[in-house]
Regions:
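Non-catalytic substrate/cofactor recognition surfaces at enzyme active-site rims
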Residues: 1-390
Length: 390
């Protein structure tokens, strides 16, 4: 069962509350995937809120109340689904092409693949369509009203195929992928309409038949941060954070983060790892389709790596933003230089910067720099997913 919500992301605590409720309904943990569309114009959720965007916020209780309500709403949705009358369907799969994404980190990888899984009734007509694309849902820019961005318009187009068609979107490896144009609802609607039309035109004819059961796995991987816990290094880290906090040009959230991390260095109250959920579904029939759902804002290089070793998108569906989003998940290629996705600022490469400041971490992820060095984030991710796909 895959549940998708139009929110930026689920934090660890909220995800675990929802997962616990679903398990209590009789669903095996490995059979449940919770995904966020990652719209940047969705409702505020707790956990990553304080102290970075809540300087003058007085209704934090309302934020928590909404999160509690959302958790129950999603659990009720699962319960309703489980109690509903079953329908006989067949599954078929195909991959189509879209072209409005760009690699914002300047790498060569650009997401074009759109995996599409269709459930058809006994009459051959589509009943449900699951589809994905790897581009940040930021085409609409910053809006003051709720806006699900391009996935919503794509869903509208697909569901216009005919009565009774349900469409669902899951976000691909979009950590370093943005729409090539952003800034208005009109832009977002245009991209969504184009994506939806592409999928709608494709589902008129069945793709490759998917058979068999599903072998599901749910695991957690521990990813190392690049932190040397010695008195001398922590003193240097504290000094670097103090300089950032005092610099007149430091943006508000980065200044607040620096203040907090300076205190953490003094108190030695910081994590040295990030815990990330991973899921793999493997269809056990002859079709050979496998689906990967990673937590975090996974960058496209991981998808490129695993597709190349598993028969491309025709055999491997790779998605991110599943279950929990504790950070961007960069590759060694990104960690070798500064950048937002890497969580490294050029003026202070030894401390957390960019996205790692936003996500409230003490340092950026560890990069393996030699064959004898400890495994870094990329090696840990590759080993875990490879094992699960085997």
């Amino acid at each position: 069962m895959i549940v998708t919500a139009d929110v930026l992301a689920f934090g660890a605590a909220l995800h675990q509350v929802i997962r616990s409720k679903v398990i209590q309904l009789g669903v095996a943990s490995a059979d449940f995937v919770l995904t966020a569309t990652h719209t940047h114009n969705g409702p505020v959720l707790p956990e990553k809120l304080d102290p970075y965007i809540s300087y003058n916020l007085t209704n934090t209780a309302q934020v928590q109340q909404y999160a509690d309500q959302l958790a129950q709403t999603l659990a009720d949705l699962v319960a309703t689904t489980l109690a509903s009358t079953r329908s006989t369907v067949t599954l078929d799969y195909q991959v189509v092409d879209e072209d409005f994404s760009r690699n914002r980190a300047g790498l060569s990888y650009v997401e074009r693949d759109v995996p599409v899984l269709v459930a058809r009734g006994t009459d051959g007509k589509p009943r449900a369509v699951l589809f994905s694309y790897g581009a940040h849902p930021v085409a609409a820019g910053s809006q003051t009203l709720f806006d699900p961005d391009y996935p919503a318009e794509a869903i509208k187009e697909i569901e216009a195929f005919g009565p009774g068609v349900f469409a669902q979107f899951i976000l691909g490896p979009a950590g370093d992928q943005n729409p090539h144009t952003t800034g208005s609802v009109a832009v977002s609607d245009s991209f969504g309409s184009d994506l939806g039309t592409t999928v709608r035109d494709a589902i008129g004819q069945p793709g490759r038949t998917i058979t068999g059961g599903i072998a599901s796995q749910y695991e957690r991987v521990t990813l190392p941060l690049d932190i040397t816990v010695t008195s001398a290094n922590l003193a240097a880290v504290k000094a670097a954070y103090d300089r950032r906090a005092a610099a007149p040009g430091t943006i508000g959230y980065a200044r607040r983060h620096a203040q907090r991390m300076s205190a953490a260095a003094t108190n030695r109250s910081f994590a040295t790892t990030v815990d990330l959920p991973l899921q793999v579904w493997k269809f056990t029939g002859t079709s050979g389709l496998k689906m990967v759902f990673t937590g975090g804002e996974i960058v496209s290089g991981y998808a490129v790596y695993f597709r190349a070793r598993n028969g491309g998108s025709n055999n491997l569906w790779f998605s991110g933003y599943a279950n929990e989003v504790p950070a961007y998940i960069p590759s060694n290629e990104l960690l070798a230089r500064d950048g937002y996705e890497a969580g490294i600022d050029s003026d202070s490469p030894g401390i957390a910067g960019g996205s790692m400041s936003v996500y409230n971490h003490f340092g950026h992820f560890l990069r393996k720099t030699s064959s004898t060095a400890p495994d870094g984030v990329e090696e840990k991710m590759v080993a875990a997913i490879t094992r699960m796909l085997a």
